Amino acid sequence: MDSIVNVVEDDVKYAQRVTSFSSPQNANVKVFTIPRHSFTAFRLSYVSPTELSACSQVTLLGGIPKQWYADQNNQVWKLLTKISLRKVRKQSDMLRRYGYGTIYKKRVGKIPTALYLRKHFTWSYEDNTSIHNGHRLKEAEMEMKRTRSSPVQKSEYKLSLPRRCRSSSDQNFMRQELLKEKKSELSRNNSLPLIDTAQAVDIHPVLHEEDQENTNKRNKSLLSNLKRKDLGESKSISRKDYSHFDRIPSPSSARSVGETDFNYNREPSEDTLRYPDSIIEVTNRTSPAPNSILSRSGQFVNSNDLSDGFSTSNTINNVGLNANEKIFFNALQSMEKENLMLWKTSQKYGTYLDERRKSADAFQKRERGSCVDIGKLHSSHLPFINILPPWPTELTEEERIIHDRLASKHSHHIRKHVHNARNKTSCKIKDSVGTFLGMTNSLTNKATVKKRTGQILKKEKMLVMVKEAIQNKVPLPNFSENECFDTRVSERWKEYIVIARSTGRFDPPILLQFYRHRHIPEIEDISSIATKYHRNPLDFFLSRNCIVKFYSSLDKTISIQKPDKRLGGFIDESIEKKDELKHYSPIKIFILRCSSIRSSGRWYKFLLESLDRQLFTPAINLKIPLTEISIKINLNEIIFQKLIDLGKQEKDRLKICFLQRGYKIFQHPILRYFTVAILEKLKLAHYDYLIRKWDTENPVLGCALKRYDRLEWIPCDEDSLVTGIFAFCQSHLIQYRPIANRLRETKSLEGKCLKEPTPIEGFLIRLTDKYGSARTNFGKYSISTAYFFTCENLLFSMKAYRANPPLPIDSMIDDTSTEIEKEEIWKQWKKIPEVYEQQPYPLDTNDHIEWMNCQTTQSEYDSRDFYAFHCFHRRIDQILKTDNVIDLTEVKDIYQGTRTDYEADKIKYGVYKEASEIFWHRNYEIDDVSRSVINIETSNGLLLKLLATSATVAEEWVIKLKQMISYWKNKQREDTERLLKIRRSNAGLLMLNGEEETKIGENTLRWIVEHGRADEQTFNANGISLSRPLIQKGPLYQKPHKHSVFSKYYVVLISGFIVLFHCFHRSTTGFAKEVLEYAHYVTIPIDDCYLYSGTTTELDLLQRDRTFDEINYGSHALPRVYGDGWRSVEDESSRCFTLWFGTRRALSSNRLQKKGNEKQYTQDYGRQDNNIDPPSAPEADLNNSNVPSNTDKIHFTKKLGVSGKSMVFMARSRQERDLWVMSIYYELERLRRTASTSNSRNQTM
């Protein structure tokens, strides 16, 4: 197993191991890194570049109308719409915060503006991805391509030793730069190339202003000597030999040095320390001037990703020098390597190295002399290291001042370390003495040991329901939502802050408390907890005779069976027959609904470990679906900890291997360990075809949890992997398989292969109302401007003013854009063709993203990455703002107007002509207007008429929409057939009839659950990969409260919201009327809700259809048949899920008084911690970015310990219910992680 760990740690070995078939045996491996917290890195962790490019492409038809541009600049109209659309704007801002905080882990104030993207956009890397000789271009070839394809000219470059390598006394003198002057323009976009991990790249620091002046003087004198040497003695050396100098990075080649506030006291990056002796031919790369990473705006750049030094070894080997010059530069290299090591040591212990100072002083004396010709230098003149006696060197006055400043700067950290060491020592003494005196038990779990009595071990806000058994008094190990004994509800769903406190005893180890208020002390006296007046009657001690299980494997609800406290020790089921039990009370069942699946896994693991029931197992069984075999992988604690530590080192950068075709993503070390171990096992089992298939197709591999016919994909981060593997291994089967995204092709009834069309968007003039009438009730023509766009099988429409069309990266505007900028950008909009394709991820012939390769600079990557995020967010934001939607599978026909149509009603088409001229600011003929009409006929016989900008655009709309209708009708039929096929296959394989198949639940035998087949396309990974704007869609039945009636809605799930559309339009008398489209009903934010499903939803349902069934006792299901052939006989509870929202109340936030009260409460009851209730993602960002100055401002908070509001949704079948629940849980998981990240950041600020 250690050899596998070595392969995982070595990037080159791992890349060669997983690409053994597709790559040549001795091929050079090129590995580079990108920021992990970026939109591109997040999506590449789940999808291939081909799928990513196809999902991101959008086509704009018709261009940008002049009237829309005028409306955007109309301040009066903007003010009126701002007031009327304040709710929509608020939801749009929430969506913006959701997406940015989830992907980039930053606050809202850091979101880049359109001006930033236009400013930092440089050029596209066109024809710049062909790589030779170990993935690098030849110098001459690369230079020609740079000159031909880039408008950026080369700038001045310098060579400098790292600032951190020098002592404080000679920082102004210990610099040797080599400068070659070139007459070229200064580029503001040259930046650092993406960091190479297989061969590390070191980055030089930016010099101070006074250091820069001294450096320039020395550069001129040194350059004059070099020129004289070159002209006088080295005429034989051609100019080509010195062509490498222009690629040596310079700290001042991009901008002035005063613009950057750089931290020189920071340690070097991991790549620099890991590869201090690496030599990289940076001459084959783009000029790495650090203007983007160290820029003032800094929206994307994380300074922790930088290395403070620039290695001279990166360029010296490529410079044509004579023998004496090479001796000089070799000395510089050796000094730099020693300085790097000595600087690391000095930073650790806070001392100055006198050996380094003496050698530096010796070198300074030679430098301060008259300009010595480099060619005349001899090895005897170079600096050497002196061996000094072991007493301290006397410091000069300047050195003493610097030393005192550094000492005062780090004194706080020193005192902190001393305090922590003292606390650790005192804790060890207390534990040793307590164990010796018998005050503690050595068998106490790790979760509760070394904790004071009454100290908080774990805390979270969650939903709680309490049930009580009617007769049973002994907990059962197989208790689940399919309850095996009769129970009644004693406490309905209520939200509490659940606190787990240490008792300091072996049994019970912890105390669970349910708080109704937020003033919670960190340490509380629990000796007299039963007599306290503010005690919640739900509080109980978690004794070792309690049983902790998952109540539901779908929503991961936890159940705790608590027997009577008078029953001590472990209870056997046979005790139930004894007469003594009749004096005890029945058991209580506490059902805990955490905010996310990851949180449920953590609490489940914590509760079991508190009861000394460990979940960690050294042997993990992974099922390989394509082989129908299971592989046991040994993962002991030592190896597991190594992988966790390696994952922490890679938490900020994502490694990517540049293959001949596509990329190979370096996932979390745990997944890499699984990959190498499984490949070894498959080789031994002679499954070479599977290894070759994975190698040639290059899929993204991951883990999934399977239970019967349901697949639950585990996100590829550390917390989700650990929770999913160890917490859910008892209830689910762990599979290792390629991450499946939704296929982009289908087959027609004739067997023809159909490809998914590209989504289209554009401005159109609507000529009919929702009833298909061309005139209103008052006789006027129904004419309105609208913006239509497609997303999968849905055609959305909104008012034209709300639209946000796809624009190039250098033509973007937002609310911060000025009038002058808008006028300049409008000139660019005029040049946009009638058919414009927006593609943030263009691919070359080798499936490589054109702008993401080894030559991509950091600023270029940042601007391109956020542009891709903006494109994806723009599409979701438009769905949030939409007014109506048309299901294209319900469209009967689409056709274009003809020239003869206007003859029937010339007046009407004359009005259409005037409307087109006003909106598009063009001149039209009547026959052109008639050919620009798009007719959409729905299945209910109504006709929708749309007017395009020209006949050509109308024809393009008709062709694209017909392709979409044909594709999505066949795709919908194929999805339904796939569900039916899987259900019939499982019923036949397990010999189950229809009634038995619908009763598959928590108490089903494990062999039945494991042998069930699941379809990866039905339960695809779209929910965790964000490959498409629509996470889930389809018809659902919904009711707002218990005693209302279910109504049918078309529901769309997007990032952070659930959008409901009316399926019917009813008259005043209640009759349904035929309409063209589904109208928007309500938008529900899901960031602050709880989701539960299964039998727990029975509390929200009415008891109906309770007729006695003589054939199936206890069954109250009603058989149903749908138009697409699907049949269902499940109960209502198995088809329903509920969204629970807490009740809010208004509170006065006089924070000064509140803080004073909390301070007094802390003095009385111990240290106060009010961060138990972490705000949601939008609330946290809003509270941080817009802190009000008025302390008496009213704010809203949720009540605790009270019933909330619930919205019940019902699907057609259990399979569809599972799809919706898993999709919502994926999104809730992402939102909860964003909220916790924002809350932890607020605590540190």
Swiss-Prot record:
Domain PH, chain residue ranges per copy: 1030-1229
GO cellular component terms given for this protein: prospore membrane
Broad class of the protein's primary localization: membrane
Keyword Membrane: yes
BP terms from Gene Ontology: ascospore-type prospore membrane formation; protein localization to prospore membrane
Pfam family for this entry, one: PH_SPO71
Matches recorded under InterPro entries: Mug56/Spo71 (IPR040345), Mug56/Spo71_PH (IPR039486), PH_domain (IPR001849), Spo7_2_N (IPR029217)
Localisation: Prospore membrane
Superkingdom to which the source organism belongs: Eukaryota
Disruption phenotype: Abnormal prospore membrane formation. Abolishes localization of VPS13 to the prospore membrane. Accumulation of vesicles within the prospore membrane lumen and reduction of phosphatidylinositol in the membrane. Abnormal spore wall formation; the first three layers are synthesized but abnormally deposited and the dityrosine layer is missing. Sporulation specific septins are mislocalized.
Motif interval(s): PxP: 385-399
Compositional bias of kind Basic and acidic residues: 227-247
Membrane-protein topology: Peripheral membrane protein
Role of this protein: Recruits the lipid transfer protein VPS13 to the prospore membrane during sporulation, thereby aiding prospore membrane formation.
Name this protein carries in UniProt: Prospore membrane adapter protein SPO71
Source organism per UniProt: Saccharomyces cerevisiae (strain ATCC 204508 / S288c) (Baker's yeast)
